[in-house]
């Protein structure tokens, strides 16, 4: 009887996933070959004491602000986040405090969320919670794996498939490429147009499959962030 119940559960899960659309990236933009930790330090210095930048630091900052990937993290350019609000980012587990859920949404390309269970992290998830007044989301952007440098990225696991939930209902499967680059997914329109009495809402990302790391079983995600409408 137990075996029959297990088979029925498996069949139900397969049928559920079969009804969920699969999405491939609409674009993948490579990370430029540069020292990302130096970029991080220069951007931090610019935010606190811009006039103290050296000529070399200023040149690096200009490069960063013009780069289609790095500008998301280190420039003051307008984006969905001019109006976008996130109440919390939580996770089912984390390897340690320095790999906590919020590291997947801290706008730093040298930190990451790393799941904390035994094995490769299949079934672990990140959940993003939004107030009802939040502008609507149309795009999910992902840096897959621990991208701060090549060795760390290669040694740790990366996500192959993410099951995306909207308000705890399966919404789409995101097929991620095995790359350090920025992957963009068009996900329709999420959130509420009429925000006066709109309830809070959420997006969850559950690991379905992974690309194994060369050295560790741990699976990492550097950033998941968003673009959308209803701003400016």
Task: Show the residue positions of the predicted features.
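Sec-dependent N-terminal signal peptides
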Residues: 4-14
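Boundary at the C-terminal end of the N-terminal hydrophobic targeting segment
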Residues: 16-18
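Trp- and acidic/polar-enriched beta-sheet ligand-binding modules for extracellular glycan
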Residues: 20-45, 49-55, 120-123, 146, ...
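Disordered, acidic Ser/Thr/Pro-rich linker "stalks" and the adjacent N-terminal cap
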Residues: 20-129, 154, 230-232
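Exposed beta-strand and adjacent loop surfaces of beta-rich binding modules
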Residues: 86, 137, 159-161
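A short, local hydrophobic-aromatic micro-motif
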Residues: 87, 138-139, 201, 222
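Extended extracellular/luminal ectodomain segments enriched in beta-structured repeat modules
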Residues: 121-123, 132-141, 200
């Amino acid at each position: 009887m137990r075996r029959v119940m297990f088979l029925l559960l498996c069949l139900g899960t397969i049928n559920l996933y079969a009804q969920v659309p699969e999405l491939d990236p609409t674009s993948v933009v490579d990370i430029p070959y540069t020292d990302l930790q130096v970029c991080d330090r220069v951007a931090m210095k610019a935010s606190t004491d811009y006039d103290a930048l050296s000529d070399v630091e200023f040149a690096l900052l200009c490069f960063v602000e013009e780069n289609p990937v790095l500008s998301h993290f280190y420039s003051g350019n307008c984006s969905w986040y001019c109006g976008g609000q996130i109440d919390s980012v939580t996770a089912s587990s984390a390897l340690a405090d320095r790999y906590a859920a919020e590291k997947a949404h801290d706008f730093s390309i040298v930190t990451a969320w790393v799941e904390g269970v035994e094995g490769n992290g299949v079934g672990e998830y990140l959940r993003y919670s939004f107030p009802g007044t939040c502008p609507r989301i149309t795009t999910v952007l992902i840096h897959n794996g621990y991208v701060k440098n090549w060795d760390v990225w290669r040694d740790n696991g990366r996500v192959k498939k993410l099951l995306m939930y909207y308000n705890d209902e399966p919404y789409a499967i995101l097929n991620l490429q095995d790359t350090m680059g920025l992957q963009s997914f068009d996900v329709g329109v999420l959130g509420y147009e009429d925000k006066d009495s709109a309830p809070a809402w959420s997006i969850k990302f559950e690991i379905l499959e992974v690309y194994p790391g060369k050295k560790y079983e741990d699976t990492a995600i550097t950033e998941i962030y968003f673009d959308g409408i209803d701003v400016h």
